[in-house]
């Protein structure tokens, strides 16, 4: 079930560097591990909290007695033509730069946004008058295990674990120049 850390200080996993220890901190690497941990927590009525890279999160300095599930290691993506499919732990900065390198346009605004794609989708992250809802085609919701299209509304209990985009193909030099202007 991924990497399990006991009494892990949460300040190590947030951009604000605050937070006390979590009784258990589990880094999952794929959907099967994520499902296994969530089912375990539900079966045993254990409080759980899902995080990505910890940007825009504030944890109490008191101990968290439940399980923190980190999606940070779910960081694989692949490109098929102009369509990008990514796990939720891919960082927005990495995806923006990697897409620019191969001439895909549409993610340039993410070039300076901390955090990962899953959290970015959840809060509709954006910059430079663009946001993720403008480029996301669909996402995979753990609770329903089906693809949901971007016109649907996310509930607070939604756990994103996969995303897909349709981008525009441009000459690499144009995309890189646009990215460098940001």
What are these regions (language model features)?
Residues 5-6, 12-18, 57, 141-182:
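Phosphate/pyrophosphate- and phosphate-bearing ligand-binding catalytic cores of soluble enzymes
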Residues 2-117:
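Anion-binding (especially nucleotide phosphate/pyrophosphate-binding) glycine-rich loop
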Residues 8, 33-36, 72, 83, ...:
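Glutamate identity and glutamate-enriched acidic tracts
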Residues 19, 26-31, 58-75, 122-146, ...:
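Structural signature of FAD isoalloxazine-binding scaffolds in flavoprotein oxidoreductases
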Residues 99, 117, 121-125, 171:
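Short, well-ordered alpha-helical segments in soluble proteins
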Residues 16, 25, 46-48, 109, ...:
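Broad hydrophobic/π-residue packing in well-ordered secondary structure
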